[in-house]
Amino acid sequence: MKKEDILGRWRIVDWRQDYDDGRSSYPLGQALRGFIEYSAHGMFCVIEKTDRPPLSASQWTASEADKVAAYSSYFSYAGGWEVEGESDRGTVIAHHVEHSLYPNWEGGIQRRTAQMRDGLLYLSARFEDGTPEARSAHLIWRRDA
C-alpha cells in the first residue's frame, strides 16, 4: 500500500480490542462517530461516543465526575505520519504523535498495521505486551464521501 492510497478522511466503522486472555471490549462502546485524516501535512484522529452528555457547567467549572465522563467518552491525537514499509501482516504506518488526549503518547510513535479490503481501511496495533492487559486493537474505517 502506498501513501497515496491512504490520503484523505476516513470515518470510523468499528473499534474493538482483543485481549490475549480471550476477552474482547469496545473501548467507547459500539455507537461511535469520528474520523482519521491523512494529509500531506499530517494526521488527525478523533473518536467519540455518539451519546456524550453535555457538561453540567462550563469546561473549566464542570464537576470532576463530568470531566471524567467527558474524558472517558472521547479520544483524539494528531501529528505527522509516514508509511514505514511492509510486514507479514500489512503496511506499517507510523503516527508521530505531537498532541493527544492521552498525554503519555505525546512525543512518541504509534505504529499501525494497515490493510485495505473491500474499500475499508483496517488499522491494528499491539498494546501493553507482557502485562495482563496485553491486547490487539482493531479499527475499521470507511473513506469519507
Can you annotate each of these PLM segments?
Residues 1-145:
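Lipid interaction determinants
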